[in-house]
Amino acid sequence: MTRRGAGMAATIGRLCGAVALALAATAGKAADTPATPTPVPAEAFAELPFISNPILSPDGASIAAQALIGGKTKLVVFKADDMHHPLVFEMGDKQIIDVNWAGPNRVLLTVGLTMNFYDIDIPVSRLLAIDIPTNTVKLLDKKSRGILAGDVLYTDPAGGSLLVASQDDPFSTPSVKHIDLATGAVAIAEKARPNVWNWYADANGVVRAGIAYDNNRWTIWYRDKAGDALTAIKGKRGKDDDSGTVDSLRFLSGDNSGLIVTNARTGRFAAYHYDFKTGTIGDAIYENPDVDISSVTVDPISGVVSGINYEDDRRRIMWLDPKMHAIQAKIEKALPGAEDTIVSQSNDSNRLLIWSGGAADPGTYYLYDRKAARIAPVAQPYTKLAQVELAPVSAVHYTARDGLSLPAYLTMPLHRGDHALPLVVMPHGGPFARDDWEYDPFVQFLANRGYVVLQPEFRGSTGYGKAFVEKGYGQWGRKMQDDVDDGVDWLVKTGKVDPKRVCIMGASYGGYAALWGAIRNPEKYRCAISFAGVTDVDAILHYDRRSFSAPRYFKQWQTKIAGEDKIDLDTVSPLPQAARLTIPVLIAQGEKDVTVPPRQAHQMVTALEKRHANVESVFYKEDAHGFSKPEDMADYLKRIEAFLTRYNPS
């Protein structure tokens, strides 16, 4: 399963120069980006990242990462100071989900595959341990057959054992297991409990808490120290001060105090002091007036929360640790104008792995050695775009017809001016998700072809607080669609776009919004493009029902889609309304999609062809709810270009 990677070494050698950036200097990226003649080949935008999810070993001596070699995803491990002799581990048909270290010589690898349970194809995961000195791979916890298998709660500093939360099957809640990495022995450290999906351990390896949800109320099962029984701390229902959702917990070992991330107080996720003994939420450690915090960063040794992560127009971190705050400032001085994220660090914080990039920069990984006062490039994930000038992306706001302020991302094509340009509006998938200020190949491809691209954060998008999400409940095809249309109207009023040259495009929920926009508002759009779009909302609800572990969870999801008034979903579904379509559409889907079944697209294409509608379609046999084959994505991009050239030319 492992071999020495000569080809890999050559590739890394090309990517990893001897260039070093002194932190005292104000140098930017490793190389300036010259202007590039357009159009850039579709293949450059279809490139999958060469390297992803890199992580430093605890001693800072090695880097493990996911790499794409010869069209196959593999795990690579190489010395941080000598990247020319990597180890390469074959993955076969497994997907890499997560990479971690257990000590300096062992990599923990969570991999995913699909298994069939009761005629349902369900993604499951497995946890592997890779011993670097012997190049051996061991499957841990052979009984685990759930979606969750690699939630590592605690790793022994010496790398000898770990605590992991895992399911025995996809429908049960996880238990916590102690795994001896030398022998592979597995012991139950904490039995599974009803409705407890999240477990937490402290820096001493003690399972301190689990969070359960039932009947719109959270319960924290908590113990003060090892040997104590778990006791229940129940949250309040309704609109009480401490109702809401708990996202995360952290502890101070041997103490009843800790940190809780919850939206209980303001409807936005924020970090608060928490007394586990009394179940009392205390003063805020950090809350943002506009957006949720997304996660907390924990010191790898002490387990103390060192930073708070949040995302407004771009990803940011507020360091609570003064040392890390100073380190971040030095990094941003050396690599200005980008999102500079510390993705991994050695236990002594001397070496840090940094990702630096943004919406118009596919990014570069750097290794920062503090003692040497040096930042050196490790790899550029997208090698074909290394010298390509990409279009700028701005965070904007506009007002919906009912007065709601909506954030969005606006991309303007280079060298085209800013008046009466063609537009592609691109609502995101989810729909309970959000866009971010990161490189998006579809956005940049469209901009490279001369199109303005608007990515609206319609109501229901996450990250902007509970109230904003709930405004989207029951609004599929209604107010959520209004928000997309209102974004087009706003841009038209600015004069930036030509109202007669607008197309709508998206994937998953975004694909639904594209098809529904074409049916509902043909006067606004010249064409629509859908990848893996939902065409029958009621059918997708019934399809999703099989993956819920209890009827009440399905009912909650059903309410989010159909609303409290349970509208007739056929009235907002493209398939039942196919006869109303009058503009050209392009429909695409991966045949291995288990999120939106391909039959939704096939049925829509058949219905439109029977009515002699202007429909083009393509189905990719080896792809799922996204592209895993660059050649397929390149083909799709070329089809998009040809389709737009015919129906919405730039």
Q: Language-model segments: which ranges?
A:
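Conserved hydrophobic/aromatic "anchor" residues
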Residues: 56, 65, 101, 398, ...
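Active-site-proximal cap/loop segments of hydrolase catalytic domains
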Residues: 458-650
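Beta-propeller folds
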Residues: 18, 28-352, 359-361, 368-371
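Structured core elements
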Residues: 259-260, 306-307, 352-354, 366-367, ...
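Flexible loop/turn segments at secondary-structure boundaries
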Residues: 267-269, 292-294, 313-315, 360-363, ...
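An N-terminal hydrophobic leader/cap segment in hydrolases
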Residues: 361-396
